[in-house]
Amino acid sequence: MNILLLDGGKDFGHSHGELNHTLHKKAKEVLTALGHNVKETVIDAGYDVEAEIEKFLWMDAVIWQMPGWWMHEPWTVKKYIDEVLTAGHGKLYHSDGRHRVNPTEGYGTGGLLQGKKHMLSLTWNAPIEAFTREGDFFEGKGVDAVYMPFHKLNEFIG
């Protein structure tokens, strides 16, 4: 399997991104040992937008390794998404999926990466109960509810 590893760890403030960098390196080591083809990007180290588009076209699955910052991905990961996906118009997606005949239907179905998979590997300074327990901070909705927009962006392109 062709796997794209995206390391969203960031050295900022009191966080140095070391845990995410370590998990990223371990994933690369394990996946390579298992016989997978791996390409990677350490987002904070910089990237070439066109090369990233080609990596998305190449991959069968992408693993996003990143910390939870203020209930979202770090701003550098958001910038990466905005730059790469916008430049990928025509290669990663052709439109938002709607048609002139009925513009109220089909939104989110214009992705060109059908059959590709994604996985989030997330680090938080929060116990799992903060996400899963009723009455706690995330009201028992779970981690995937916090990241629903992130899952949808991956679904949008594929």
Annotate each predicted stretch with a short phrase.
Residues 19-29, 141-157:
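Short, solvent-exposed amphipathic alpha-helices that sit
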Residues 37, 62, 158:
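Residue-level detector of anion-binding/catalytic polar loops
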Residues 32, 113-115, 156-157:
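A short, structured loop/turn motif at beta-sheet edges
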Residues 4-6, 39-41, 63, 119-121:
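Hydrophobic/aromatic beta-strand patches that form the interior of the parallel beta-sheet core
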Residues 12-13, 47, 127:
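Flexible, glycine-rich phosphate/dinucleotide-binding loops
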Residues 50-150:
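Helix-loop-strand module that forms the ligand-binding subsite of alpha/beta enzymes
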Residues 34-47:
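A short beta-strand-loop structural module common to alpha/beta enzyme folds
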Residues 1-34:
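N-terminal beta1-alpha1 ligand-phosphate binding loop
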